[in-house]
């Protein structure tokens, strides 16, 4: 049986500035800040890891990635993870914060439901 993945009820405070930094590579800093404020206000939704992965169109970071390895260790130690921050953009999904968490959870159990804030 696959070990459960534990989650915080809400993203941690440091996830939002990280989201702004990443989104600022794709849109203007003003738009990135506005999107991040909308993410703060958004309710938590749940999506399967495999669906987030497919919608993002991103390659999967492997076990050799240090951040993925650290997150897999947290899962094994039953430590809580922070929900993802997602932005719908055109016909794709942008992972504003939580890419390595998504990759780790996908490798652990691709059918696991991941809590997310999505706008």
List the model feature ranges, each with a label:
Residues 27-28, 65-68, 96-100:
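Short amphipathic alpha-helical surface micro-motifs
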Residues 38-94, 106-107:
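Short alpha-helix boundary/capping and kink motifs at helix termini
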Residues 2-9, 81-119:
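A short, basic-hydrophobic beta/loop patch
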Residues 1-65:
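An acidic, glycine-rich, mixed-charge low-complexity segment common to nucleic-acid enzymes
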């Amino acid at each position: 049986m696959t070990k459960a993945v534990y989650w915080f009820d809400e993203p941690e405070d440091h996830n939002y500035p990280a989201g702004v930094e990443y989104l600022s590579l794709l849109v203007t800093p003003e738009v990135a800040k506005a999107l991040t404020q909308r993410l703060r206000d958004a309710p938590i939704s749940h999506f399967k890891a495999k669906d987030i992965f497919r919608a993002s169109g991103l390659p999967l970071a492997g076990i050799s990635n240090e951040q993925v390895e650290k997150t897999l260790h947290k899962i094994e130690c039953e430590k809580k993870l922070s929900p993802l921050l997602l932005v719908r953009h055109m016909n794709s999904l942008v992972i504003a914060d939580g890419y390595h968490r998504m990759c780790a959870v996908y490798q652990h159990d691709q059918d696991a439901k991941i809590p997310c804030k999505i706008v």
